[in-house]
Amino acid sequence: MANPHQIYRHDAAWDRQVFRSLATSLILHGHIKTTLDRAKRLRSVVEKLITKAKKNDLAARRQILSFLYGQKTKAGIKVMPYLFNKVAPRYQERNGGYTRIVRIPSRLGDNSKMAIIELV
């Protein structure tokens, strides 16, 4: 498993921004295609966010709001209400393991290992 504290080639701000964006997209769309290393690191980020969302108190809302982007989809769905009203209730009986990583063939351009990460 990838080291969660490892920073790729960039600084910590770049690293945080990439995983904020990936986590927001995963919550909104349910699955995304990315590199295998990013998927492994994203798994721990998203699972912590969903665990906090299951608490459904003010402190959890503020912590998640400070991390996720407040964007909407084309259908007008906002991230925060969707996470607290649709995603978190699905996992009330589950104590972790909210995501699944499925390996797919390598990318043609640079032969990077690719994966699809999805909410179970």
Swiss-Prot record:
Disulfide bridges in this chain: none
Gene3D superfamilies referenced in this protein's UniProt entry, alphabetically: Ribosomal protein L17
GO terms for cellular component: cytosolic large ribosomal subunit
Pfam families (alphabetical): Ribosomal_L17 (PF01196)
SUPFAM superfamilies: Prokaryotic ribosomal protein L17 (SSF64263)
GO BP of this protein: translation
InterPro entries found in the cross-reference section: Ribosomal_bL17, Ribosomal_bL17_CS, Ribosomal_bL17_sf
Protein name, as recorded: Large ribosomal subunit protein bL17
Organism: Mesomycoplasma hyopneumoniae (strain 7448)
Gene name for this UniProt entry: rplQ
